[in-house]
């Protein structure tokens, strides 16, 4: 259009806890295990990584976020759902960090576009496995080297288009 436009863009993914049958039946355990970490626009789902897993998930975007959520209740609302999330209704996320309960990844971008301007945001969802001796980069810090390399491989539109054509 000929006028500047302001809009809010939200992303959302609900992480599994690595075992679909257990995820849907063992609520007492599941609601006490969820763990996440946020570094800039990357949300790391690291449930049980320290104790018994050698893998984690990462949900990222290639642009700086305005806000984020990692708690389903914070993003969707206690009695809400993905059809009409509370964060979207409010126009922003609350920067929640999930400790147990239902970990999610949600990004919020507040954008202003000049007339005729286009903006691309790349979202990625990845799964990372680390050898046991390489699980941590420092005591208690998950080794993010493989995740960072993956995010760097898909950081631009051209990189994503090239990867898609190679499929």
Residue ranges and their predicted role:
Residues 1-4, 102-103, 114:
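A conserved hydrophobic secondary-structure block that centers on an alpha-helix together
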Residues 2-90, 132-167:
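Polysaccharide-binding surfaces and accessory modules of carbohydrate-active proteins
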Residues 5, 111-129:
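Short Pro-Gly-centered flexible turn/kink motifs
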Residues 59-61, 107, 125:
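Short beta-strand element of the conserved SAM-dependent methyltransferase core
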Residues 76-81, 100-102, 126:
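Glycine-centered flexibility motif
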Residues 89-101:
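Active-site-adjacent bridging/hinge elements
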Residues 95-98, 108-113:
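Beta-strand-rich interaction surfaces with strong enrichment in secreted/lumenal proteins
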Residues 100-103, 165-167:
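Substrate-binding groove/exosite segments of carbohydrate-active enzymes
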């Amino acid at each position: 259009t000929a006028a500047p436009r302001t809009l809010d863009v939200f992303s959302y993914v609900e992480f599994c806890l690595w075992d679909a049958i257990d995820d849907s039946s063992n609520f007492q355990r599941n609601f006490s295990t969820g763990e996440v970490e946020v570094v800039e626009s990357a949300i790391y789902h690291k449930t049980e990584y320290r104790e018994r897993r050698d893998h984690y998930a990462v949900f990222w975007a290639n642009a700086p976020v305005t806000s984020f959520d990692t708690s389903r209740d914070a993003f969707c609302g206690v009695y809400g759902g993905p059809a009409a999330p509370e964060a979207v209704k409010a126009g922003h996320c609350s920067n929640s960090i999930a400790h147990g309960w239902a970990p999610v990844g949600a990004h919020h971008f507040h954008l202003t576009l000049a007339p005729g301007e286009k903006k691309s945001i790349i979202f990625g969802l990845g799964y990372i496995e680390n050898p046991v001796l390489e699980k941590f980069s420092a005591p208690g810090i998950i080794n993010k080297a493989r995740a960072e390399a993956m995010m760097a491989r898909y950081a631009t539109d051209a990189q994503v288009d090239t990867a898609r054509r190679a499929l």
